Each structure stands twice: as structure tokens, then as C-alpha cells.
Amino acid sequence: MEHPFQLLMATSIAYLLGSIMGAYWVCRYFQLPDPTESGSGNPGATNIYRLGGPVPATLTLFWDAAKGAAAVCIAAMLGLSPYEQGVTAVAAIVGHMLPAFHHFKGGKGVATVLGAGLALAWQTTLALTLVWAAVVYWKRISSLASLTAALMAPWVAWRLNPEHLALFLILSLFILIRHRENIINLAKGKERSL
């Protein structure tokens, strides 16, 4: 660890950024119900799409992705190494999943991973986004697409951005853990489509 003070500052800011849930503010603006109490109960873009359509969902997606990208940019501006930038990205994603401002009840982290990934390893993230899009187009199930991309992430990172393999392993594990209910629903054939 080359910059302990800067890393502590960056991860603290990243966690707090991650804790600002775009879904809540988008739902307030569009007068939609609380996403944690409606639809799937997840404050993420897919649930917002079901509750309010493509415009609120797109705003939620961009908000959540921007948090991940901003965390990495802050770390870079503080002169942190790529490894330390990855640690900062993880802090933002944990903030999104366990937000301090929302009783630690957050989202699944896919969009925040997308933003952080584009800022850190755009080649891997772009490839995984194409995988996600192909599965959504083929099956119309967002969670299945996210799980497929998460399972492929370590291999894709190893091929395209091997310096970030450990980060993508950790992020994949986070995504899989946060989707455990979806995995059960998929196994039972009960997962909702878009």
C-alpha cells in the first residue's frame, strides 16, 4: 500500500458515493412508489423499468454506473495505483449494496460494477456488457444476464486485463451473492422477465 491516507480518503468517499441510491431520487422525481417496497423490492434499474418504464430506468442505470466510475476517477486523481483504484471501486460497490443512508438495504451492484469496470478495465467491461446484452436479448431475463456476465468475468478479465483478474473475481462473487434469491427463482422457473 503506497498511499494509506489517500486510500482511506478515497475509499471513504467512494463508500459514501455508493450509498447515494439513484433509484430513490428517480422514483421521487417521477412520483413512483418506493422501489424497496414495490416490484421486486430491489432499488435497481430493472425494477425501476418495471415500475416506471425506460426513462426512469435509464436515469437509475446512469446514476448507479456514475458512482462506480466517479470512485475510480477520485482514486486516480489522488495518485493511487491501479490496485488501489480497484479497492476504491469495491468500496463504492459495497456502498451501493449496503448503503449507510438507507439502512444498509441497497441494490445488487451490477450498474455500479459497470461504471467502475469501464473506468478501470474498459475492454473486459465492454466484453461483459455485450454478453449481458446478448442474454437479455435472447432470454429477456436481466438477472440471468447479470449472472452469466459475472460467471464469465474472471475468464474475460484473465484474457483481456489480467492485472485486474483479482478485482473481477471479487466483483463476480459480490454479484453472485447478491443474486442468490434470483438463482433460486431461476432454478424453480419463477424468475420474472423484462
UniProtKB/Swiss-Prot annotation:
Catalyzes the transfer of an acyl group from acyl-phosphate (acyl-PO(4)) to glycerol-3-phosphate (G3P) to form lysophosphatidic acid (LPA). This enzyme utilizes acyl-phosphate as fatty acyl donor, but not acyl-CoA or acyl-ACP. InterPro entries: G3P_acylTferase_PlsY. Keywords: Cell inner membrane, Cell membrane, Lipid biosynthesis, Lipid metabolism, Membrane, Phospholipid biosynthesis, Phospholipid metabolism, Transferase, Transmembrane, Transmembrane helix. GO terms for cellular component: plasma membrane. SMART domains: G3P_acyltransf. It is found in: Cell inner membrane. The chain crosses the membrane at residues 7-27, 59-79, 86-106, 116-136, 157-177. It catalyses: an acyl phosphate + sn-glycerol 3-phosphate = a 1-acyl-sn-glycero-3-phosphate + phosphate. One of its GO terms (molecular function) is acyl-phosphate glycerol-3-phosphate acyltransferase activity. Probably interacts with PlsX. Belongs to the PlsY family. This is Glycerol-3-phosphate acyltransferase. It holds the Pfam family G3P_acyltransf. It comes from the Bacteria. It is a multi-pass membrane protein. Pathway: Lipid metabolism; phospholipid metabolism. One of its GO terms (biological process) is phospholipid biosynthetic process. NCBIfam families: glycerol-3-phosphate 1-O-acyltransferase PlsY (TIGR00023). Its EC number is 2.3.1.275.
